Amino acid sequence: MNYDELKQIWAQKYDTVPQQLEKLKQIPAVATAFNTNIDAILKITGESLKKLITDNHITVDELTNIELSNFRKPTDVIIGIVKCFSRGIAEEWVTEDVNIYKWMETNLGYERLQMGGQGGIIANALALLGVNQVIAHTNSHPKIQAEQFLNLNNLMGIDENGESRKAYDISREQDIPLIHWIIEFDKGDSFQIDGKTFTCPKSNRFIATYDPLNMSLVINNGFINYLNTHPVQYLLLSGFHSLLESNSGVQLIKNAVPVLQRWKDNNPELLIHLEIASTQDKVVRKAIIDNIVPLVHSVGLNERETIDLLNILGQGALAERIEAETNSCNLFEAVLYLKKHLNVKRIQLHMFGLYMTIQDKDFIYTPEQNLKGMMTAAVVSSSKAYNGEIAKYDDVTKTLGMPVSNQGLNELTALSEMLHKKELLEAGVCEIDDFWLSAIPTILIEKPKTLVGMGDTISSVSLLAGR
């Protein structure tokens, strides 16, 4: 079967997306926690990056074979940008040094502000998609933060009195704004330093974070009390990734366990999803696996996060293989290992051009339902990339009807051939090792206007739309 025929088959499958979007409106309540902040967006070009490098006297040797993954001094911001730019990868580095924050404020600036943090981004998306009530955790909610929430009556936060109110209207003026820099770059852009050319192989972004409250996992007591007394159907978790061992990160994770356990005990029907996110501190990464993962039903991750988990679970050889060849076959092997090792009911990977989920046979959704959820997420996330934002309901289906990508079909074909599961290529579902595997080719935007919050949107919409 040729790609034109396969694209037609998948186009017919994607026709179910409007029905799945309607099902989201049947969900009574969802909570998102714990990280909400403000993102300062900056699109950087090769030329402007070159100017930063020369103005700060950084040598070409410092930009070659970069192994650094955290900040030591302010100009390491530039090193991090070049690392991600030249490899087409996404990383988030965090700092407790206010001087680095001030350097970024002075030397980078920003083009616009928007909602940041997995919790906040997911809350906006799900409220716009029509979930009846979305309650978002904020540990800082001044007016500038409130303005990043959509002005929707079904989108709630906790006010200064510990009461639930429309998130857009809350103004906890005693709170400090939490601002992260999102530095985006485009595939094919390049710059030259001392005769060496650096070319970006894939559109992506570098995130530089100074966020004392989220880095200390400050949890709003009003939010805790609200979920203790108001059951929700889904809890979408994130925010552990910015913790540091040096800042009591492991103990902060352990402190969150009884909070989560009480929510589970009070609400046996609660379904909890954890978004792994880019966790640079290896000790914290292990603590998340040991303490938080056992409490959740579903986990979401991307290629980089998959490699990071493998490295701390003694699977360095497989991690290196994926680093060398980041493809669906190697990643499937990794996700299957993680599914078995973490013993979580559902695990979803979003990679370039393809999403895949491995789930228990007794999971509350069938693999066919999960497939529909992933296709819905592919439309919503690609529409966000195409549009730059999702500010009104009509924005969520901008890419509906666009063909699935050749990249996605390449990956799905290779995976189905490796597994000797022809049905995976056309049906998107097969049985493997007593689990269900579902996989879809996605819609890719050649020059996305934004990549912020893509993984979060994919994971949350995939899960909730798979009804």
Model-identified regions with their sequence ranges:
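Ribokinase/PfkB-type carbohydrate-kinase core domain
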Residues: 1-457, 462-467
